[in-house]
């Protein structure tokens, strides 16, 4: 895979309300594609927050007993969330290309990736008790961060 080297985080080229796509062409910052790229970036940052908050949770109770739920989240969900972050990054890069000019080296998010995500959500949902009401967005740091990510 070819990595793009970013030498600075701003160019000043967007000051007139336009931004550049991967091929250098210019589009309005209000273009739907740019909105979606921004949403991918926002969800990606929020998943990073979930990962950071989850990594802070202790594996054991103060009495020394195992916290099996925390360990399960760390073992199963963190790997999936990390993969989702990579896929969101890939999706944002793909969206920042004109459809007919996607570089061959670019990693694309495909139907298999989408199907895997749906299968994971279905499997996780099977483990939950049936919901009888809406869930208030409260709880520990990882839970609050996940609620925030869910709203984007």
Predicted regions and their residues:
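Phosphate/pyrophosphate-binding loop motifs in nucleotide- or prenyl diphosphate-using proteins
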Residues: 1-152
């Amino acid at each position: 895979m070819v990595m793009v080297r970013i030498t600075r985080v701003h160019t000043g080229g967007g000051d007139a309300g336009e931004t550049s796509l991967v091929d250098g062409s210019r589009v309005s910052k209000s273009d739907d594609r740019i909105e979606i790229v921004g949403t991918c970036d926002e969800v990606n940052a929020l998943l990073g927050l979930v990962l950071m908050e989850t990594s802070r949770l202790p594996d054991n109770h103060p009495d020394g007993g195992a916290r099996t739920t925390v360990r399960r989240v760390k073992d199963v969900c963190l790997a999936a969330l990390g993969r989702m972050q990579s896929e969101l990054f890939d999706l944002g890069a793909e969206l920042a290309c004109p459809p007919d000019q996607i570089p061959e080296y670019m990693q694309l998010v495909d139907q298999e990736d989408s199907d895997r995500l749906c299968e994971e959500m279905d499997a996780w949902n099977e483990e939950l008790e049936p919901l009888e009401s809406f869930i208030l967005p409260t709880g520990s740091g990882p839970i609050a961060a996940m609620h925030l990510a869910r709203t984007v």
